[in-house]
Swiss-Prot record:
Associated pathway: Lipid metabolism; fatty acid biosynthesis
Top-rank lineage group of the source organism: Bacteria
Segments forming a coiled coil: none
Entry function: Catalyzes the condensation reaction of fatty acid synthesis by the addition to an acyl acceptor of two carbons from malonyl-ACP. Catalyzes the first condensation reaction which initiates fatty acid synthesis and may therefore play a role in governing the total rate of fatty acid production. Possesses both acetoacetyl-ACP synthase and acetyl transacylase activities. Its substrate specificity determines the biosynthesis of branched-chain and/or straight-chain of fatty acids.
Annotated keywords: Acyltransferase, Cytoplasm, Fatty acid biosynthesis, Fatty acid metabolism, Lipid biosynthesis, Lipid metabolism, Multifunctional enzyme, Transferase
Chief location of this protein within or outside the cell: cytoplasm
Entries under Pfam families matching the protein: ACP_syn_III, ACP_syn_III_C
GO CC term (a single one): cytoplasm
A GO BP annotation: fatty acid biosynthetic process
UniProt protein name: Beta-ketoacyl-[acyl-carrier-protein] synthase III
PANTHER family: 3-OXOACYL-[ACYL-CARRIER-PROTEIN] SYNTHASE 3 (PTHR34069), BETA-KETOACYL-[ACYL-CARRIER-PROTEIN] SYNTHASE III (PTHR34069:SF2)
EC number: 2.3.1.180
Amino acid sequence: MSNISVIGTGSYVPNNIITNDFLSTIVDTSDEWIRTRTGILERRISKEENTIYMAIESAKEAIKNANIEANDLDLIIVATLTPDNFMPSTACSVQKEIGAINALCFDISAACSGFIYGLEIACSMLKNSFRNKALIIGAENLSKIVDWKDRNTCVLFGDGAGAAILSKTKEEGILEFHSGSNGLKGEHLTCGVLKANNISNKNDRLENDNFIKMNGKEIFRFAVGAMSETICNIQEKTKWDLSEVKYIISHQANSRIIEYTAKKLNTSKDKFYMNLDKYGNTSAASIPIALDEMNKKGLLNKQDKIILVGFGGGLTFGGVAIVWSI
């Protein structure tokens, strides 16, 4: 059976930068408060860009980086919790714009774990079918579901998209996954939709609950436990010692979560790549944006061992061991 490798990456973030100082003018907060509690200095917020646009731009970059044509793609999966439409799917919209006429396309929703879930689904589909190449995108326009009056959440999130292209290869690539869900704790991180149809609504605007709401303490506890356990599980499957792993690329939610996870694993936080200071939490986009940034900076060499790991609403979690092949 063929191996599956990452052969290209891409990303897109809006040009519009929102600093901590700006947020201190609209909610009761400060740069010092945000920085010391989250590690975030700024985030990118879309002006004209929507989820589809950002997904398309990241896809174009990944295709170019992989040195393939769009019609070489057999599968497109977009992980997003902020689609522009219920239908057509974001993946189908990407297919149309890039000209990937041969691809099977669909979206998935697993919040911040979405990109990991997408990789696992794609690997399974490539290994068990005639398909050879897949485009996996994490794309989010979180600014449209953030309550900009809630200082506990509005300081955390940003917009952006990241992509990776997978291909069947002879060389070692994506090795082992570990993923799961805990719906029993789902109420700790929510974003509602309209609760009723509007056929009998007498008001101009339906009351809804369509902003991100989070129990920060519970999510922190879950995140540290889920990420450390996932990494340990992947170590067991691969027989890797953490000293062999060049980087751990985790979901970019909060620097404290990463620091506590490193401490629990008895390893240095420097093993964890972080760019959340520039982009904040971009949900499903955070891991592929970081991966593309590392690829562009030349931080990864062939045969480097890396682990991607994330957690998110649902609650969900997942990780994957990869031998880098670009």
